[in-house]
């Protein structure tokens, strides 16, 4: 009887230990999967950096700017096709953060709600969504706040591209751009994502 009780106690102890180990392994597996997914999303976003739809300015035909990642006004996002050469934002850029400095580019952007680890880098990625939309009221409603990049396919348009949140501004045309063949060019929603280390 004493031997049976001793064996039963050993089996109960073994089952409890296996159950605890299994729970810890499941938690560790969840953390690994979360990390893997975060890296996948980050890699996909960085790979899209600089994708501005069908637009390619050509070699040496563009001036690059670095607007604030907090900028929300379409006119200040770094796109300007009225200049020669045209102006576009940097696709991917990094800048340091140093809490002891007040120099431009070394301070935390005003729109960041999370804390940024001191003396670390902030990576900003800019691109348009890979899926374009037709310029219609259903896709870009009145009062829209998302900036859209529209690229002209028509040699008769005075601008090669236009950035706006207002559907009425998106008037550039596709290839067959005269007479009955004239159709509005599609537009791409614009995205700016910032990555940083949080303490």
Which stretches of residues belong to each language-model region?
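Aliphatic-rich helix starts adjacent to a transmembrane/signal segment
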Residues: 1-43, 47-49
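N-terminal pilin/flagellin-like segments and related low-complexity appendage regions
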Residues: 38-199
